[in-house]
From Swiss-Prot:
Pfam family, any one: Lyase_aromatic
Entry keyword set: Cytoplasm, Lyase, Phenylalanine catabolism, Phenylpropanoid metabolism
Localization annotation: Cytoplasm
Modified residues (2,3-didehydroalanine (Ser)): 106
NCBIfam families given in the database record: phe_am_lyase (TIGR01226)
Gene Ontology cellular component list: cytoplasm
One example of a Gene Ontology biological process annotation: L-phenylalanine catabolic process
InterPro entries according to UniProt: Aromatic_Lyase, Fumarase/histidase_N, L-Aspartase-like, Phe/His_NH3-lyase_AS, Phe_NH3-lyase, Phe_NH3-lyase_shielding_dom_sf
Enzyme class: lyase
Protein's name in the database: Phenylalanine ammonia-lyase
Family: Belongs to the PAL/histidase family.
Amino acid sequence: MESMDKGTDSYGVTTGFGATSHRRTKQGGALHKELIRFLNAGIFGTNGESGHTLAPSATRAAMLVRINTLLQGYSGIRFEILEAITSLLNHSITPCLPLRGTITASGDLVPLSYIAGMLTGRPNSKGDWPDGKEIDAGEAFRLAGIPSGFFELQPKEGLALVNGTAVGSGLASMVLFEANVLSVLSEVISAIFCEVMQGKPEFTDHLTHKLKHHPGQIEAAAIMEHILDGSSYMKVAKKLHELDPLQKPKQDPYAALRTSPQWLGPQIEVIRNATLSIEREINSVNDNPLIDVSRNKALHGRNFQGTPIGVSMDNTRLAIAAIGKLMFAQFSELVNDFYNNGLPSNLSGGRNPSLDYGFKGAEIAMAAYCSELQFLANPVTNHVQSAEQHNQDVNSLGLISSRKTAEAVEILKLMSSTFLVGLCQAIDLRHLEENLKSTVKNTVSQVAKRVLTIGVNGELHPSRFCEKDLIKVVDGEHLFAYIDDPCSCTYPLMQKLRQVLVEHALINGEKEKDSSTSIFQKIGAFEEELKTHLPKEVESARIELERGNSAIPNRIKECRSYPLYKFVREELKTSLLTGEKVRSPGEEFDKVFSAICQGKVIDPLLECLREWNGAPIPIC
């Protein structure tokens, strides 16, 4: 004000704006009133239909960030105005801001002008009240208890309110919080994926990743290594890998599991770097001109350029798309019985696979999510248009990029929800597999003892030596390849059990000529006895499992990943999906999605890592 009285010429105080800054006026208050009026150029559309209003949470973040900037004292604005914005926040009154219409170059001019519009009592100003009611500026001030009434803006105060990056950076900060959570979640569920796929934990070995040097990769591997260390699933998997090792691949499949630390590592680094950049931005002074009181000087610069936002958000979106791509690859292997090490096709949990297609619809949905996510990975910042009479010829598009990244985060939440339910389904199927396989082994063993041990005259029969090899067949055969009809001669179990008896009969030599010592003669009796007892025993074991009376407890309880499983199953009340139940997969996905959106997944996620000290397991 003193500078104006002395005749000092200052941008936005005595001049017009942007390309019309050659105009001059001494009516500073009227100038800023006009600034707010012409910047109110956004479109909201019809209530509830077109969705052109910025989310209230993003608006509130913008208000908070703008207060933080203005409090630093370089913007030329009264403290009372900041107190008024604070009162609106504290009373949960949120001005309505247009979703679109800013290029985040001379700041987020258009959306921020609607906050200024409420402070100055513009008749078109609207706000949201917590009960959903839309209120005008007068009602907002009354409910917020702001006694001073609407503000008559003094010179520079209009610019101080609108000429900043708060909307883009506020939304970016919210997006990055969720992106960081989802990146950690992707690391943990990659480890769970290894558990249910009976993978080899060697891919997390510290030395492998130390030799690559990249910190994100080292962290991802260390988290997975921590989750898998001591895992009950890994102990079982080790025994399985030791069976006929020369008949199996030496290493796990290339991408979805074995390369997950190398894939996730760079994405983690990108998200961390973006977080640091946005942290700097929300704590910066980002308007123009800046008032240096100590030197009694107005500094004309361009801190309102939101390039850190646009670039950080573009990079984050690319990282999110990469995480989603890995998640889709893992999910595709999980539901495919050619790759999932014995789990049923589509993770079908019912008795009849012809009437249970499990997660087939979910895989189609995941493909759609992933495709949209890959499209969103395209950059925004290379679509700059020269604006405002070519005055803003390069601009950041920060809020646009933030909005698109928010969309990408939502899609990754959809994918994470679907995958998490799929992993819990796989965990329960492994539990079912272990219990039913134990039942099959016991039944085969008992039938072998009854039928193969004793001959017709009570003597020991040569077929008694078959039992051990029969049990080996059960151990080596994937349960879900036959369990819907365990005694079917078209399924591998009965075929291979018969093959064992035939091979022993061939070894039996001359004894096969005597019916009392012939193993061939025992095959029919063995199969008939098995057909009499095995289906009943399997069904009985399944019923007991469904009642919660499993003979073998669920291994997940002995794993560090258990808190996440427990959260999905117990707190969110989801359960094994089958074609025999009315409940659809989407109903379960919705529960998990809502929990992720509400931040409820954070505590169980951190509980999985509670014992982790932030470092890889030492090399011994």
